[in-house]
Amino acid sequence: VEFIKMTIHIKATGFDFTPALHKEVEDVMNSLAKFVQRWDEEGSVLLRVEIARTTKHHHKGNVFYAEANLDIPKKVLRVEETNTDMHAAINILKDRLKNEIVRYKEKMTDH
């Protein structure tokens, strides 16, 4: 089985974004590649992920904001998550994006 990878641009601000974290984000997000494989074969898929440490006045400590924009033909799917745990934020982001992809595919097959 060939492992599918998509083009992913990752931007991180406000914290130390180590190579290990970069790889984690890539690995988690690449698990979605099978859902966009048909579009990716056309070379028309780009996933942009942004992760930032933010300060929310009603939270103590670190709060991470994660956002993903998936450029697919004729559409941009966008999801976001705010969480005190960066790893949880990344995984929730992936799950939300997967749901958006599935919803979009269902819409496309209905027409």
Question: Where are the predicted features?
Answer:
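N-terminal, polar/charged subdomain of small-to-medium soluble alpha/beta proteins
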Residues: E2-H111
